[in-house]
């Protein structure tokens, strides 16, 4: 009797699982072959391949505009068509306005940042933060960025002081550069991780991006943020919160208290957050921007310490990795394309001369803006190596796929494989080649609808211009002062990483030598 009961239970579960994992086929969608209970995530679960590459693999092997996938037990849809992807992000934004990620503003305020917030809360915060990254604000922060770039230059000069060519792992060096920019511009800290790598902020950064130093519960909780937000909310309320985020909150709190107590004012993003907290808005008047810190009782809650900390943490996560990756991948590709390297280096030299600047001296915002070919290089790098290899959205109302009879059900998770689209030859001819000229006005050779490394529409990356500026500053410093040694062309291999970024298996090793 017991054996029969067990057989009935197992059979019932099997039938239920088969029905669950054939949902998309029954609804008429092309579907990735799913395994029970891992769905499309077997290689992710076994740490064989990162999630972004798994989505790109499915993109490559399937054929229809929309493909059914299973994120473990969660049915979702992968969009394989650039026009449809852009439509979801822009014209039909009202049907896909949320990301569907974990957020719990009330009980876990450090989870409530611009990236994950939903509905009116997101709209209000986006509107308030938008002025933070205007041209005037970036120009005001430029000196701080240039100070960090000078430390990068000093570090490289010290590593190459014997005048010989040396192979350096450039990604780790540029990660230090990016982290110090974030620490200074966003957290308001005076740090030099090149000289003092054991400072509190750098140590927290290493722990954050090194999953080996997190517990199994933390890793499971981080995965549930994306796969199953209700479970993440439950785990959070049971105490499974990331201690690093709260350590960073303490840093923000101490810095704000110090500034307000001592009357310290700096031209950085934290100062803008303080202004938003105290006045309810960020001024558009550049002359008053950094000094308008008077507060009123009703506006003190406009941006709490927790909200400042959570959004600082967001810009830290997004800004440090994307800046380091974009800059290092650009250097790596230039080493494999000497003719492109020569053109980029010549432009930097000419711009410095035109603006009356010296290679080892200070840069200016205007000079960086004048480096147009460097812009093309950054565009090509972010095409081939998007900072986030995929975008995600949640369908908030039933949506009919254009020119089909297919309907995307409400609450369905949507994945857009940027890596797949950006390396699709129908949108970008010869996608494996590094060709900055494909973006030049006079020789455009790509489908503009398919290029979206920072997202598109109302939820596009708010700090896009800052990230590009930070990368261009580092590139200009390196190209102006060092020779990059040519090397054979070879595609980068990526290893498994729990973070949704592209991590090279063996780093990015490039030969550098002094020019002067």
Swiss-Prot record:
Result when mutating residue 55 to L: In allele CYP6D1v3 and allele CYP6D1v5
GO MF term list: heme binding; iron ion binding; monooxygenase activity; oxidoreductase activity, acting on paired donors, with incorporation or reduction of molecular oxygen
Annotated binding of heme, by residue: 461
Matches recorded under InterPro entries: Cyt_P450 (IPR001128), Cyt_P450_CS (IPR017972), Cyt_P450_E_grp-I (IPR002401), Cyt_P450_sf (IPR036396), Insect_CytP450_Detox (IPR050476)
Topology in the lipid bilayer: Peripheral membrane protein
Induction info: By phenobarbital in susceptible strains (3-fold in CS), but not in the LPR strain.
E.C. no: 1.14.-.-
Gene3D superfamilies for the chain: Cytochrome P450
UniProt subcellular location: Endoplasmic reticulum membrane; Microsome membrane
Main localization of the protein described in the UniProt heading: endoplasmic reticulum
Essential cofactor(s): heme
Keyword RNA-binding appears in the UniProt entry: no
Gene Ontology annotations for the cellular component aspect, listed alphabetically: endoplasmic reticulum membrane
Domain of life, per lineage: Eukaryota
One Pfam family per UniProt: p450
Recorded family membership: Belongs to the cytochrome P450 family.
Protein purpose: Metabolizes pyrethroid insecticides and other xenobiotics.
Miscellaneous comment as given in the Swiss-Prot or TrEMBL entry: Expressed at higher levels in LPR compared to susceptible flies, it is responsible for monooxygenase-mediated pyrethroid resistance.
Name the UniProt record assigns to this protein: Cytochrome P450 6d1
Biological source species: Musca domestica
Gene: CYP6D1
């Amino acid at each position: 009797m017991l054996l029969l009961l067990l057989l009935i239970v197992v059979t019932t579960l099997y039938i239920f699982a088969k029905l669950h994992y054939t949902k998309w086929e029954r609804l008429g969608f092309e579907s990735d072959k799913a395994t029970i209970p891992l769905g499309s995530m077997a290689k992710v679960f076994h740490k064989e391949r990162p999630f972004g590459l798994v989505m790109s693999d499915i993109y490559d092997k399937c054929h229809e505009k929309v493909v059914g996938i299973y994120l473990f037990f969660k049915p979702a849809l992968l969009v394989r068509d650039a026009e449809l992807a852009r439509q979801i992000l822009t014209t039909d934004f009202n049907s896909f306005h949320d990301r569907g990620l974990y957020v719990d503003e009330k009980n876990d305020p450090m989870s409530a940042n611009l990236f994950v917030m939903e509905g009116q809360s997101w709209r209000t915060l986006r509107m308030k933060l938008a002025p933070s990254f205007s041209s005037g604000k970036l120009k005001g922060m430029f000196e701080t960025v240039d100070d960090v770039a000078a430390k990068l230059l000093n570090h490289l000069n010290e590593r190459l002081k014997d005048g010989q060519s040396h192979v350096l792992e450039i990604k780790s060096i540029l990660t230090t550069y990016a982290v110090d920019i974030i620490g200074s511009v966003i957290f308001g800290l005076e740090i030099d991780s090149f000289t003092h790598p054991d400072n509190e902020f750098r140590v927290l950064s290493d722990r954050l991006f090194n999953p080996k130093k997190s517990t199994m519960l933390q890793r499971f909780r981080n995965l549930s943020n994306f796969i199953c937000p209700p479970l993440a909310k439950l785990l959070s309320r049971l105490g499974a919160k990331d201690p690093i985020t709260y350590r960073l909150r303490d840093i923000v709190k101490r810095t704000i208290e110090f500034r307000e107590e001592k009357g310290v004012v700096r031209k950085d993003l934290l100062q803008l957050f303080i202004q938003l907290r105290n006045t309810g808005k960020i001024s558009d008047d550049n002359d008053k921007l950094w000094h308008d810190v008077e507060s009123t009782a009703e506006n003190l809650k406009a941006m709490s310490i927790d909200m400042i900390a959570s959004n600082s943490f967001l810009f830290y996560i997004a800004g440090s990795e994307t800046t380091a990756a974009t800059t290092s991948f650009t250097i790596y590709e230039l080493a494999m394309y000497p003719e492109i390297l020569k053109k980029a280096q010549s432009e930097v030299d000419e711009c410095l001369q035109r603006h009356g600047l010296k290679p080892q001296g200070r840069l200016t915002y205007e000079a960086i803006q004048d480096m147009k070919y460097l812009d093309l290089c950054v565009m090509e790098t972010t095409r081939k190596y998007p900072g986030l290899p995929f975008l995600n959205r949640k369908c908030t109302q039933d949506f009919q796929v254009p020119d089909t009879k297919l309907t995307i059900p409400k609450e369905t998770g949507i994945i857009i494989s940027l890596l797949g689209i950006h390396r699709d030859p129908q949108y970008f001819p010869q996608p494996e080649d590094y060709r900055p000229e494909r973006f030049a006005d006079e020789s455009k050779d790509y489908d503009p609808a398919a290029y979206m490394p920072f997202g598109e529409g109302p939820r596009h990356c708010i700090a896009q211009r800052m990230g590009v500026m930070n990368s261009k500053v580092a590139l200009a410093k390196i190209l102006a002062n060092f020779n990059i040694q040519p090397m054979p062309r070879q595609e980068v291999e990526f290893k498994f990483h729990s973070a949704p970024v592209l991590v090279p298996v063996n780093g990015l090793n490039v030969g550098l030598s002094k020019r002067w």
